[in-house]
């Protein structure tokens, strides 16, 4: 049997250790895993889904159900394997998000949203003792870093997709409406409002709050932020990331900075709470699998059973399975940083995500529309107003309805 997932080193280790335990219990089953970091992963899996040679069990992004199996053709309806996989362990809302084309195409591993993480070791060096709680705090941090630490130090760095999410967070906070209709993907914002959002991101770069993408690329090419020398050594002192990424970023810091890693506060940029929560990932069984019952048994082991759930812990986020969460907590396997971040996200976010927002043509590193938009801004190739046209054309091309 085969299984695939993406993630960082600690997630790879958890999956592999859990698989060893599963094989010890099921000696007639051998599991071959395939795994890597996120960069380029969706393109690889999309090709496998189209070719019909994807793994039996796949860790999937929520929007993949819409992108690759909107007709229910790629993934097994898990209601048909409820004898092997206990579907009663999940809340209806989380399960409903994975119900597409009249089919329970995956079970949610965890729910997630975005939050700020800060390296307070560097902030303290800049004379700042509290995490930023407002836009004014962010702008003041940019000024302090530049003046006290120098041009090479920044309060945070965000890649293009991260900038898009923060821009939407800002607009939702200011205007109190979802980015787009969560069912029809009809955009809820005007060109002027979006230009305002892009200008907000530009102001963070201009104010030395965020590193210019051109500067980042020249030093790191396409290296992920947590693997960059600037993050590891504390020159980049903040990120806006999924709550489940806490371990990946904290463990990457060198010894001089590790103790400074801190879960920040959600920032209100207007009268409303911005941001969304979503199914962070699911586990699905491909319709090309020849061992569907065994695949369902493996998923149940990883997410619902004591041995599996206590090993997986919070490596894929805070478990959405009620049984899995209890077993992980009892084993002390839920990382406090992830739990703290998730609790803050879930208490704050109220907006819904539409299924096209994470379309790979929009969010892909290096080639996506979001990348093009924010590259153009940082390279000075477009004004915010011009960048809006690029963004809307790209959104329309993947199926958004532009009002």
What positions do the PLM features span?
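Glycine-centered hinge/linker elements that transmit conformational signals in sensory
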Residues: 142-143, 186-219
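Mature extracytoplasmic/periplasmic domains
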Residues: 13, 74-75, 244-251, 281-364, ...
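C-terminal capping/gating helix-and-loop segments adjacent to ligand/active sites or protein-protein/ligand interfaces
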Residues: 340-396
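Extracytoplasmic/periplasmic solute-binding protein
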Residues: 101, 105-109, 114, 139-194
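Hinge/lid segment of periplasmic solute-binding proteins
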Residues: 61-113, 260-266, 335-336
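Extracytoplasmic/periplasmic substrate-recognition and gating elements
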Residues: 24, 32, 102, 126, ...
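Short helix-initiation/N-cap motifs at beta->coil->alpha
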Residues: 35-44, 63, 135-139, 214-232
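Conserved N-terminal structural module of periplasmic/extracytoplasmic solute-binding proteins
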Residues: 1-72, 80-87, 130, 220-221, ...
């Amino acid at each position: 049997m085969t299984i695939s997932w993406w993630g960082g080193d600690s997630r790879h280790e958890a999956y592999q250790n859990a698989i060893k335990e599963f094989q010890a219990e099921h000696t007639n089953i051998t599991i071959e895993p395939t795994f890597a970091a996120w960069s380029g992963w969706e393109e690889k899996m999309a090709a496998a889904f189209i070719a019909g040679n994807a793994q039996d069990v796949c860790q999937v992004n929520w929007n993949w159900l819409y992108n690759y199996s909107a007709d229910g053709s790629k993934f097994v309806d898990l209601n048909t394997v409820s004898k092997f996989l206990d579907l009663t362990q999940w809340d209806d809302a989380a399960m409903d998000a994975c119900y597409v084309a009249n089919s329970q195409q995956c079970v949610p591993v965890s729910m997630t949203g975005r939050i700020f993480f800060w390296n307070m070791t560097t902030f303290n060096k800049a004379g700042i003792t509290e995490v930023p709680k407002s836009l004014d705090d962010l702008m003041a941090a940019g000024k302090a870093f530049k003046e006290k630490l120098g041009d090479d130090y920044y309060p945070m760095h965000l890649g293009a997709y991260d900038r898009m999410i923060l821009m939407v967070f800002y607009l939702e906070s200011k205007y109190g409406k979802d980015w787009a209709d969560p069912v029809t993907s009809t955009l809820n914002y005007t060109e002027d409002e979006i230009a305002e959002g892009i200008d907000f991101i530009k102001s963070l770069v201009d104010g030395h709050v965020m590193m210019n993408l051109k500067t980042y690329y020249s030093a790191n090419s396409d290296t992920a932020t947590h693997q960059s020398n600037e993050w590891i050594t504390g020159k980049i002192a903040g990120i806006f990331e999924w709550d489940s990424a806490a371990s990946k970023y904290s463990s990457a810091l060198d010894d001089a900075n590790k103790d400074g890693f801190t879960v920040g506060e959600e920032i209100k940029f207007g009268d409303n709470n911005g941001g969304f929560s979503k199914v962070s990932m699911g586990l699905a069984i491909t319709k090309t699998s020849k061992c569907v019952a065994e695949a369902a048994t493996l998923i149940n082991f990883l997410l619902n059973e004591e041995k599996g759930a206590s090993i997986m812990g919070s490596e894929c986020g805070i478990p959405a399975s009620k049984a899995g969460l209890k077993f992980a907590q009892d084993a002390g396997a839920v990382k406090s940083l992830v739990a703290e971040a998730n609790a803050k996200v879930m208490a704050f976010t109220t907006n819904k995500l539409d299924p096209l927002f994470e379309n790979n043509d929009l969010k892909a590193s290096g080639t996506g529309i979001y990348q093009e938009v924010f590259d153009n801004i940082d390279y000075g190739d477009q004004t915010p107003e011009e960048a809006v046209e690029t963004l809307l054309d790209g959104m329309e091309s993947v199926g958004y309805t532009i009002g």
